[in-house]
Amino acid sequence: MQIKIKEGIIKENILFIFLAALLMAAAVLQLTIPLTKFFSFEYSVVNSILITFFISIITIQNLHKKNPESYRDFNTGTASNLFLFFIIPLIIAFINTVLKNQCPFYHGLPYYFTIVFPAIFVGRGIGIFVFCAIRRFRNIGLIFVYLLILTIPLIEFYLNPQVYFYNPIFSFFPGNIYDESIRVDVTLITYRLINLIFFESIAVIYFLSKKIEFRRGIIVIYTLITSLIFIILSPYLGFSTNMERIKRKLPVSEETANIRFHYGNERTKKEMSYSTFEAEYYYHELSEYYKTEPDKKIDAFVFKDSGEKRDIFGAGNADVAKPWMNQIYLSEQTLNRTLKHEMSHVFTSKFGKYVFEVADKINPVLIEGIATASEGFYDDYPLHYLAFQAYKNGYLTELPELFSGLNFFAKASSSSYLTSGSFVKFLVDKYGIEKFKLLYRDIDFMKHYGKDIATLNKEYIEFISIQDFPSNKAVANYYFGRKGLIQKNCPRYFSAKTEEIFELIAKRNYLDAKEIISELELKNTSWALTYAMIECNQGLGEIRSCLRYIENKETTYKGTAYEEILAIRKADMLFLDDQTDKAMNILVNILSTSSVHRVYFLAKTRIILSEKMVIKEYIMGNEETRAHIFKKIFLQTSNISLIPAIQDKINYQDKKNDWILEVVLKGTVKNNYEKYALIKLSELLARQGNYGKAKQILDKAKKPEGECIFNELLKSVELKLLRLSEGKTQLQNE
């Protein structure tokens, strides 16, 4: 008798048992996949998607077979099942955390409760709606409704100026550009509370009436009308962004023949004018490069900082283009570096594919490769120069590997962008842009080039290998010795804790910051943590302790992008410990490696300041103190290597600073790095509207003549200055 009862219970709950087993298997599978293997945001999102769907199925079955009479009966009959659905992924995550000792379990709890707990009620609401709206084939109808809700973000992504989404099934998506910093904030909590209340209200309303037909009609009408009202109010609640919202935030516009810029009130008229001039110049360059141009004006939205951009658009840490909308989204701090790259994405829409007008199979190698190739430079170095350094020092990725799966994202972004850009530039230069356009729409190398990717890869490597550049291990390490996205350990947790650390450092709460750093370093190696620990030790005056810490880290960062930066910080500590000779030896050694430009200037600046006996004041000083020191020493030495350290702190529109330019013009350019410093100063002057002085500085950069890795950059800037100095009217009428 008992066996029969148990068999009956199992038979009655066979669907639940099957779905629970499926949920358990999915949770275990997630632990093998990058990002979802950590108990964090992604893990919660995936389980929210699954639990919502499974509970919808169970709800439909419960209403169909058991037909509960009241809201109380409905809850009583499903409470244990709902609880088990909620707890299964949580238990598996807990066991995994204990066994692998990765992210602290408490880190994932806010994500899980905020995202997954409301999913229970969302699933019930969807199930009731489908039960009421569809009479036959309800499971098929459920799949349709479920997919419809999931596709709403695609509609928003396509039509609205945003890349983030709020959705009742998966709660929140920060954008198609990965951002490690996602917090459970007031907006997300509010959104999930609204989800919970709305979808559970469907259940309450369903049981208010005893008449089945009335129930069905009122549920359908209530759900559709409430959903429509929510969609209309969504931009005002901060859950979506329409054009009205973005223009309220960026009310100032500047327009030319081909570009329309949208700014906040912070930018000056001169700054806006330069950006539009520069954009017009890039527009003409890209038109010549692609042999085509967009059908309508490009709209460029420029946010004051990454925080504002994240709140309004999403993707705070990356600039983005929407080619199908002829729109680009930039931050004030990155505008001058990324403007041409993002504009290039808009140009590729002319030969792009699908509704989003991008590369075939949405291939990132082609999408980012052609935009990078059209610039010709990466961080002011020629693309092939950096690819050559990768080849010579064992970093260059084989193209078949880069085109495969998620390998583009497995590498550090600098490595993937550089390799893609250099390869695509090789293809365009050798075979022409028209063949590449065909490839962009249809990734079939044999069809369009008569060669497969392996053969083209061999051609490309042969081309790179014979480039006439000196090999430089330091440059290769700097750009290619970094971790990729899916190689990082517990990225959400470490990002949140790192932000907390730097907030504590800003408040000079060094002891609490050190305690967190020490805890994190037991599980992860991160340059941000290393840098923060050095700052804490310096702030506490624990110089000897800091030196020991740095020496222990030297092996860790050997051959990486941070090796020389760590050496510079070691030199700083040696200066503070009165070990000047040792510090100078480190800095001189860095100069001898012909490192990247910014590392060279960091080292050279310290050597100059040490010789002038102000190095300690510089290391311990704040930004204002450092700016004063730089001006003073520059006046004494006229050393052009100091220019990069002061140029962002100087307003050259102020006549009081004319003396700096006069000193520069009287000085002597001693090496290629100083040539580079003058090129960047020239660009800055042009940005501030002083084209005359910009040209004088650039003319100065031409001497001495001879081979220089920055000669291509110099020619590019010279041509741009020539065009910009001709004025806005001529640029528009060309």
Model-derived features with residue positions:
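Hydrophobic alpha-helical transmembrane segments
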Residues: 1-62, 721
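Juxtacatalytic substrate-recognition/specificity segment
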Residues: 42, 246-363, 374, 378-382, ...
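Acidic/His/Gly-enriched intrinsically disordered linker/tail segments
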Residues: 146-150, 179, 183, 315-316, ...
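Beta/coil-rich, acidic/histidine-enriched accessory regions frequently appended to metallopeptidases
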Residues: 152, 156-165, 169-183, 192, ...
